[in-house]
């Protein structure tokens, strides 16, 4: 499902949604990803030593599995099913149940626009998974990490990742909620004013964090030591939550991997979002109904999911992003952060050195990036006037248009916007910035003839962080150097989650971000990155950001795959 592979980049219009969908289909075909649900941790659930474990939540008891590898509780409801009269409403409390609820199987993924024949998807999807270390509850509660998956706000689920090793090795509780996708998570219409209009998905994430606050102590976690972390669309989501008043106090730290919400395209003004909603309601046959909201809520879920968005979003035209100017995001995130109206918590933030190569590689399966016509056509989909960009990257394009395209996505969509976000945050709270770099990063897609080297592509750090299969990768086969690096990377993340500082004995010092250069994280080297801004041409992209009119650009994003 490629959920975490295609993320959004806020600073640049990369792919129109029809092309984005084709890329996801290609990726899914190459990975056979539809049936894979690594987060169900079958090796743990079906282990010979697995025993039932019952935990009491505020809605009822749940029965998970405990064994030598860890403890897991899957498919736990954190909100009522958002169906029927609850569609396009803020999440409501999960109904209580009697007896003990089975929690050994994950719930379905939230209904995406592109389903590729997937069977385990549903509009009724607001469940979460809890991964805990083995053994009894500790004397002191454990730090909690809440994972927000990627997928361009259109795809993905909490079972795309096996988070059990992270929980066990770092001695933390990891919680992975689902959240509504696409139209169900971001639809806006004048008939739906209030109740989370245009940002239901962000309220789902907040509801999961409130569930953590109420219930995580029963699983051995510390409700007041919570770190949200996510990649691609997950990082965008966390960036939104930094600017969302309703999320205040729900987390104490944040980790953003390959996602920055500073560009104007990261959210859509209410007027524009509602215009798109009116057009979509017309297409669905509801605009002339006496009760537009009731009509929209009565439609079959598949019909709603399949309808063309009729608006702009993170991936360009006919895509989705949260609405600003409403209850959830009163201000665009960039303005909220500039005005210091954001959560001032410690942040760990970064990107991968070759983010754009994954997108260029996927486009190579359906297009001809090395032809001038194909290259220029793609750039015109990314930017209303690409002439300055083509001129700035003419030296790279003269050698390889494929490389130029990949660099444009990396630099303008990820590296430089993320650096700007770090600059905006670091004067008020600790910021630790990184650039992940690994020329031999494990790769889960089928290698076709004439494949280009992918290097540290988008989402390639995840196999090191989780050290378990995820939707784009099987069981990692690390070299000794890669295994040592994976342990160090995970130790940085775990220490930050526990204390707000990634540093500790036995690993290189990670200085606070000074507004300029991040720390290089690589199996071969952990150290300063003095040439980051120059290599990614950030002077150019920072100037473009100040010149770009609102909502004139967008890009691919996120996925987890997340």
Where are these regions (language model features)?
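Methionine residue identity
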Residues: 1-2, 14
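Non-catalytic accessory segments of hydrolases
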Residues: 33-199, 316, 372, 469-489, ...
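Short, solvent-exposed turn/loop segments enriched in Gly/Ser/Thr/Pro and often Arg
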Residues: 180-182, 229-233, 435-442, 508-514
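Extracellular structured ligand-interaction cores
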Residues: 59, 123-127, 143, 171, ...
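Substrate-gating cap/lid region and adjacent catalytic-acid/histidine neighborhood
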Residues: 261-262, 298-481, 492
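Bacterial N-terminal signal peptides
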Residues: 21-31
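Serine-hydrolase-like catalytic core of hydrolytic proteins
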Residues: 37, 111-289, 293-294, 309-310, ...
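Bacterial N-terminal signal peptides that target proteins for export
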Residues: 8-21
């Amino acid at each position: 499902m490629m959920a975490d592979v295609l993320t959004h980049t806020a600073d640049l219009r990369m792919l129109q949604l029809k092309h984005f969908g084709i890329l996801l289909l290609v990726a899914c075909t190459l990975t056979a990803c539809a049936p894979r649900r690594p987060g169900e941790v079958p090796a743990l659930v079906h282990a010979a030593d697995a025993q039932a474990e019952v935990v009491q939540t505020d809605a009822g008891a749940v029965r998970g599995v405990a064994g030598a590898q860890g403890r897991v509780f899957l498919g736990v409801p954190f909100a009522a099913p958002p169906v029927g009269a609850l569609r396009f409403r803020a999440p409501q409390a999960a109904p209580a149940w009697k007896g003990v609820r089975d929690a050994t199987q994950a719930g379905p993924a939230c209904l995406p626009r592109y389903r590729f024949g997937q069977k385990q998807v549903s509009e009724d999807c607001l469940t979460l998974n809890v991964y805990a270390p083995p053994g009894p509850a500790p004397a002191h509660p454990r730090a909690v990490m809440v994972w927000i998956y990627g997928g361009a706000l259109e795809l993905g689920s909490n079972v795309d990742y096996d988070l059990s090793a992270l929980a066990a090795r770092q001695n933390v509780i990891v919680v992975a909620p689902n959240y509504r996708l696409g139209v169900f998570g971001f639809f806006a219409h004048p008939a739906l004013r209030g109740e989370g209009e245009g940002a239901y998905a962000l309220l789902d994430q907040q509801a999961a964090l409130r569930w953590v606050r109420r219930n995580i102590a029963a699983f051995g976690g510390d409700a007041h030591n919570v770190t949200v972390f996510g990649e691609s669309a997950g990082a965008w989501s966390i960036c939104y939550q930094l600017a969302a008043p309703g999320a205040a106090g729900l987390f104490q730290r944040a980790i953003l991997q390959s996602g920055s919400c500073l560009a104007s395209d990261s959210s859509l003004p209410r007027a524009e979002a509602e215009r798109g909603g009116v057009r979509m309601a017309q297409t669905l046959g509801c605009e002339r109904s006496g009760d537009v909201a009731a009509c929209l809520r009565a439609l079959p879920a598949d019909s709603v999911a399949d309808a063309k968005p009729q608006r702009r979003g993170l991936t360009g035209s006919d895509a989705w992003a949260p609405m600003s100017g409403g209850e959830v995001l009163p201000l665009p995130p960039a303005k909220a952060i500039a005005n210091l109206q954001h959560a001032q918590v410690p942040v760990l933030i970064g990107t991968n050195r070759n983010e754009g190569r994954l997108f260029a590689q996927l486009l190579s399966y359906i297009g001809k990036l090395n032809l001038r016509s194909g290259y220029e056509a793609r750039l015109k989909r990314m930017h209303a006037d690409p002439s300055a960009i083509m001129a700035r990257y003419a030296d790279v394009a003269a050698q390889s248009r494929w490389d130029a395209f990949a660099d444009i996505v990396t630099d303008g969509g990820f590296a430089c916007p993320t650096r700007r976000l770090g600059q905006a945050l670091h004067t008020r709270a600790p910021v630790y910035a990184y650039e992940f770099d690994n020329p031999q990063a494990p790769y889960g897609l089928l290698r076709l003839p004439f494949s280009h080297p992918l290097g540290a592509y988008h989402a390639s750090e995840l196999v090191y962080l989780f050290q378990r299969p995820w939707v784009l990768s099987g069981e990692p086969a690390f070299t000794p150097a890669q295994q040592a690096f994976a342990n160090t990377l995970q130790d940085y993340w775990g220490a930050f989650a526990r204390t707000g500082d990634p540093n500790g004995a036995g690993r290189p010092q990670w200085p606070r971000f000074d507004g300029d250069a991040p720390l290089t994280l690589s199996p071969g080297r952990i150290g300063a990155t003095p040439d980051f801004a120059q290599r990614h041409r950030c002077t150019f992209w920072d100037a473009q950001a100040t010149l770009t009119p609102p909502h004139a650009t967008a890009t691919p994003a996120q996925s987890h795959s997340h």
